[in-house]
A protein has these predicted regions:
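A short, solvent-exposed beta-edge/loop patch
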Residues: 78, 96-142
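Juxtamembrane extracytoplasmic segments of single-/few-pass membrane proteins
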Residues: 1-73, 77-80
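Ordered hydrophobic segments in well-structured contexts
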Residues: 59-60, 71-75, 84-87, 109-111, ...
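Short, conserved beta-strand/beta-arch hydrophobic-aromatic motifs that form part
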Residues: 73-76, 81-103
Length: 142
C-alpha cells in the first residue's frame, strides 16, 4: 500500500512558494501602479485596511485561489526584486513554520490579528523591514 500524505502535512510556506512559482510568468515585469484605494478594496474581505503606502511600490494586487479558499496576493517592489505578500485566513489548515527557503526564494510567516501574512522574496532580500512596514500600517476590523 502507498503511504498517503495527509493534508495537514502541507505547510503554508510550501503552498505559498508553489503559488509564487506558478504565477511568476503571469506577473513578471507587470506594474499595475496599484493605488491604496485598490489595495483596501481587496483587503476589506480579510478585515484589514492598509493605512498608507509611502515608500512602497505595489505592482500587483488581487484575490487568488489559495489552497482551500481565497487569499490576498500582493506584489511589492523590494530592494532585490519582487516581494510577494499573501494574507491567508487563519482557518486555513496548513502547518506554519516561521521561515522557509529553497535556495532561490525565502519566506517568512507572521501571524497577525486577522490573518497569517506570508512574505516571499529573493534569498538576498531582507524581508524583516518589509514585514515591519506592512505590520505597522495594517489596521484590523476583526
Amino acid at each position: 500500500s502507498w503511504p498517503l500524505t495527509t493534508q495537514s502535512e502541507l505547510s503554508l510556506g510550501q503552498v505559498a512558494m508553489a503559488h509564487v512559482y506558478g504565477e511568476e510568468p503571469f506577473i513578471k515585469d507587470v506594474d499595475e501602479k496599484v493605488s491604496l484605494r485598490t489595495i483596501n478594496a481587496k483587503m476589506e474581505k480579510y478585515g484589514a485596511t492598509l493605512m498608507g503606502m509611502d515608500g512602497m511600490k505595489v505592482t500587483y494586487v488581487n484575490h487568488c485561489a489559495f489552497y482551500q479558499g481565497p487569499a490576498l496576493h500582493m506584489v511589492i517592489q523590494g530592494k532585490m526584486g519582487p516581494v510577494t505578500l499573501f494574507l491567508v485566513p487563519k482557518h486555513v489548515p496548513l502547518t506554519i513554520q516561521p521561515d522557509f527557503a529553497d535556495g532561490t526564494l525565502k519566506g517568512e510567516i507572521l501571524p497577525l490579528k486577522g490573518a497569517n501574512m506570508v512574505l516571499i522574496g529573493d534569498m538576498q532580500e531582507s524581508l524583516a523591514p518589509v514585514a515591519q512596514q506592512l505590520e505597522s500600517r495594517l489596521h484590523w476590523s476583526i
